[in-house]
C-alpha cells in the first residue's frame, strides 16, 4: 500500500535533508571510541559500535544525533578512505590470514588473502604490501584487503629498509643497464689533465662528482675551476637509462646504504672522478676578487681532467687545523688545499655580508654491523673541509643560475620565496611583541628577508627564529628563474651533482647547449613535479628508517638512568618533542611527565612554551636533560622524561 507512495518518498527526503550532518576526519583512540574532527575547534563523539564501520583517518560524512544535550556521530558515507595501499604484518596462516597495518593508530587485524598470481605462501610475521578491497561504508559487510606484494620475513635484520622502501613504493636496487661508449656530442673538450685537481669527500664515498682546482692571480684575485662528472656524455636524452633516472629523480641516501639514480657502473666508476683516472667533465671557470665577489667573466666549458688526489674531509680539516698525522702527499696538493681554504674564507665572508649563511648543524651517521644492527650513532660536525666543498659548490651553482637565466631564460632552479605574503602582518605583529620592528611589505623582499635573518642570527637564542619558521613558504623546484630567500640569492640552479640528481643532469644538457650556441627546450612542468614528489618520498623514507634504527639503538636505555642532553624542537597540547643532541633521535615527552596537575599546566604550540602555574618553565630551543622512559618498537617511538 505504501510502495511507490510519492508522499512517503517526499517525507523521507525531507527527514533526510533536515537531519544534521557533518564532514570530517575520524580520529581513533585506544579505548574503542573515536571522534569525528570537523575542524580545529569542533569534533563529535563516535561510539564504539559505530567505530567498527570506519578506520582512523577516514574522511567521512556522518549523521549527527543529539540526545540529552550530548551529540554523537553516526558514519554514513565514505568521502576518502585513509587506507588504500599500505604495508603491514601478516597474522594466521594459509586460508585464514589477516594483516595489521604498520601504523601507530591502526591496531585491528584486517582479513585478507593473497592476490592471484602472487607466488608466496604467507605465514605469521611476514611483511606484505596490501590494498584495501572492501569497506563497510561502501556497502560491504566488513573491511577486506588483498596482499599484492611479499616484502620479507619477520626476523629479517633488514626489515627497516625493505619495509620502508615498499611503503613509499621506492626502488630497492640500482637501475639495470650499461653505457658502453661516450656519445658524440659535438663538444670540444679542453685538456686539463695536467692540472692538480683534487676531490674532497667522505672516506667511503665512491660516487665522486666534483673536483676542484684553484690558482692565485695578480691583484689578489683567485681563480677557481669546478669540474663536475659528466653522465650526460654517456646517457642520451630519452634513452632507457635516462628514463629510469627521470623516474628516480635522485639517488636515495638511507642510513647504511644508498640506492643510486644511475647504474653503479656509471655512478661509482665511469663517471666518478677517481684519483689518477682520466674523466670527461663539465667545468666552470670563475674569478674571485679580493672580497670574494664572483666576477662577470664566468666560463662554462667541456674538458677532460685527471684528479690527482682523493682527499678525505676529516684529514683535510685536521691538517688545516694543525692536528692529526695526515699530510698532503705533495707540495702541489698542499698548495691546492691552502688556496681552496682561502677561497672558502672569501666566499664565506661574501655570503655573510651579501647573502645568508646557514647555521652549522652536525650530520648524524649510523654505524651499522653486518646484520643491520646499530653499533653507534655519531655526530659529524661540519668542519673546514666540508665548508670548502660547500662554498665551491654554491659559487658554481650561482654561476650556472646566472648563465642559464641570461642565455636561455630557463633551467632547473631551486626557488624559495621566503615568507608567505598572507602571513606578513601576523609575522610583523609577532616580532613586535619581541621588540623587533619590521615592515610587513619590506620583509617580503629579498633584502628585507636577509636583513631580518641577520637580526635573528644576532639574537642570544634561536627561540624567536623557531617561532617564525611556520610563516615561511617551502622551497620549490621551478623551470623559471627566481630568488632563493633561504640562501639570500637572486637565483640558484644546481648542476654539481648530476650522478645523484636528475635536475642537475638537465642543467648539464642546457649548459652544453649554451656552450655550443644551440637552442634548447624549456623543461616541462611534469619533470619538476616528479622531482619534488621524489624528494618528499626520499626524505620520508630516510626519516622512517632513521626512526626504526633510533628505536633499536635506544631500546636498552629505556628505564635506565642514562641521561641525554635534548633540545626542545616542538611543543603541542599533548607534550614536547625533543631532539637528543648527541645522536639526533627525536623523542616525545608526554604532558603528564612535565607536571602532575593538568589544570596547572599550559602547553602552547602558538607561543612555543610550557607554563606551570603561570610561570614559563620550558620553551622551544631550550636544552634539557632527559632519560628514556620507554621505547615502543611497534610504533618506533621513543618516550622520554625530563630529569627532575
Swiss-Prot record:
Alphabetized UniProt keyword annotations: Cytoplasm, Exonuclease, Hydrolase, Nuclease, RNA-binding
Compartments (UniProt record): Cytoplasm
E.C. numbers: 3.1.13.1
Pfam families: OB_RNB, RNB, S1
Keyword Cytoplasm: yes
GO molecular function, one term: RNA binding
Coiled-coil region: none
GO terms classed as biological process: mRNA catabolic process
Catalytic activity entry: Exonucleolytic cleavage in the 3'- to 5'-direction to yield nucleoside 5'-phosphates
Domain RNB: 189-516
One cellular-component annotation, GO: cytosol
Residue ranges constituting the S1 motif domain according to the UniProt record: 561-643
HAMAP family tied to this protein: RNase_II
UniProt function note: Involved in mRNA degradation. Hydrolyzes single-stranded polyribonucleotides processively in the 3' to 5' direction.
Family: Belongs to the RNR ribonuclease family. RNase II subfamily.
Name used for this protein in its record: Exoribonuclease 2
Amino acid at each position: 500500500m505504501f510502495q511507490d507512495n510519492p508522499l512517503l518518498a517526499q517525507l523521507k527526503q525531507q527527514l533526510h535533508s533536515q537531519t544534521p550532518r557533518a564532514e570530517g576526519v575520524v580520529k581513533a583512540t585506544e579505548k574503542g571510541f573515536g571522534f569525528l574532527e570537523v575542524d580545529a575547534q569542533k569534533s563529535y563523539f563516535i561510539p564504539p559500535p559505530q567505530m567498527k564501520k570506519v578506520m582512523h583517518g577516514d574522511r567521512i560524512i556522518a549523521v549527527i544525533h543529539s540526545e540529552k544535550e550530548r551529540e554523537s556521530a553516526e558514519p554514513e558515507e565514505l568521502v576518502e578512505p585513509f587506507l588504500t595501499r599500505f604495508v603491514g604484518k601478516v597474522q594466521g596462516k594459509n586460508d585464514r590470514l589477516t594483516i595489521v597495518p604498520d601504523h601507530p593508530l591502526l591496531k585491528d587485524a584486517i582479513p585478507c588473502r593473497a592476490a592471484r598470481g602472487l607466488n608466496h605462501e604467507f605465514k605469521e610475521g611476514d611483511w606484505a604490501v596490501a590494498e584495501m578491497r572492501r569497506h563497510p561504508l561502501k556497502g560491504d559487510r566488513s573491511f577486506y584487503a588483498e596482499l599484492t606484494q611479499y616484502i620479507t620475513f619477520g626476523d629479517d635484520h633488514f626489515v627497516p629498509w625493505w619495509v620502508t622502501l615498499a611503503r613509499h613504493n621506492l626502488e630497492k636496487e640500482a637501475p639495470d643497464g650499461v653505457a658502453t661508449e661516450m656519445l658524440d656530442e659535438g663538444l670540444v673538450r679542453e685538456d686539463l689533465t695536467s692540472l692538480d685537481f683534487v676531490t674532497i669527500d667522505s672516506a667511503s664515498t665512491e660516487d665522486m662528482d666534483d673536483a676542484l682546482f684553484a690558482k692565485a692571480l695578480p691583484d689578489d684575485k683567485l681563480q677557481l675551476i669546478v669540474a663536475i662528472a659528466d653522465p650526460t656524455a654517456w646517457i642520451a636524452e630519452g634513452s632507457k637509462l635516462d628514463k629510469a633516472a627521470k623516474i628516480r629523480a635522485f639517488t636515495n641516501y638511507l642510513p647504511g646504504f644508498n640506492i643510486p639514480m644511475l647504474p653503479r657502473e656509471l655512478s661509482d666508476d665511469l663517471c666518478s672522478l677517481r684519483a689518477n683516472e682520466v674523466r670527461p667533465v663539465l667545468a666552470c671557470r670563475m674569478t674571485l676578487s679580493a672580497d670574494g665577489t664572483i666576477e662577470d667573466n664566468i666560463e662554462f666549458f667541456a674538458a677532460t681532467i685527471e684528479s690527482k688526489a682523493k682527499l678525505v674531509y676529516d684529514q683535510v680539516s685536521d691538517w688545516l687545523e694543525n692536528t692529526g698525522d695526515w699530510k698532503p702527499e705533495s707540495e702541489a696538493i698542499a698548495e691546492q688545499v691552502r688556496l681552496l681554504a682561502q677561497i672558502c674564507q672569501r666566499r664565506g665572508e661574501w655570503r655573510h655580508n651579501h647573502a645568508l649563511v646557514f647555521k652549522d648543524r652536525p650530520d648524524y651517521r649510523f654505524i651499522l654491523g653486518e646484520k643491520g644492527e646499530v653499533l653507534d650513532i655519531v655526530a659529524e660536525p661540519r668542519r673546514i673541509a666540508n665548508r670548502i666543498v660547500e662554498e665551491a659548490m654554491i659559487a658554481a651553482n650561482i654561476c650556472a643560475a646566472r648563465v642559464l637565466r641570461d642565455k636561455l631564460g630557463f633551467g632547473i632552479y631551486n626557488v624559495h620565496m621566503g615568507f608567505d605574503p598572507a602571513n606578513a602582518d601576523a609575522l610583523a605583529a609577532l616580532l613586535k611583541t619581541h621588540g623587533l620592528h619590521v615592515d610587513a611589505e619590506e620583509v617580503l623582499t629579498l633584502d628585507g628577508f636577509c636583513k631580518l635573518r641577520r637580526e635573528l642570527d644576532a639574537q642570544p637564542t634561536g627561540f624567536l627564529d623557531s617561532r617564525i619558521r611556520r610563516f615561511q613558504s617551502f622551497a620549490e623546484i621551478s623551470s623559471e628563474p627566481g630568488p632563493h630567500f633561504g640562501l639570500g640569492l637572486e637565483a640558484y640552479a644546481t648542476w654539481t651533482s648530476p650522478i645523484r640528481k636528475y635536475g642537475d643532469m638537465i642543467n648539464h644538457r642546457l649548459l652544453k647547449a649554451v656552450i655550443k650556441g644551440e637552442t634548447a627546450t624549456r623543461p616541462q612542468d611534469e619533470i619538476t613535479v616528479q622531482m619534488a614528489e621524489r624528494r618528499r618520498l626520499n626524505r620520508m623514507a630516510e626519516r622512517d628508517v632513521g626512526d626504526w634504527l633510533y628505536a633499536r639503538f635506544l631500546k636498552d636505555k629505556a628505564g635506565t638512568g642514562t641521561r641525554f642532553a635534548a633540545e626542545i624542537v616542538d611543543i603541542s597540547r599533548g607534550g614536547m618533542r625533543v631532539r637528543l643532541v648527541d645522536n639526533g633521535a627525536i623523542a616525545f615527552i608526554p604532558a603528564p611527565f612535565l607536571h602532575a596537575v593538568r589544570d596547572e599546566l599550559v602547553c602552547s604550540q602558538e607561543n612555543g612554551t610550557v607554563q606551570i602555574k603561570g610561570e614559563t618553565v620550558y620553551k622551544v630551543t631550550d636544552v634539557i636533560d632527559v632519560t628514556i622512559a620507554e621505547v615502543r618498537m611497534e610504533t618506533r617511538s621513543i618516550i622520554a622524561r625530563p630529569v627532575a
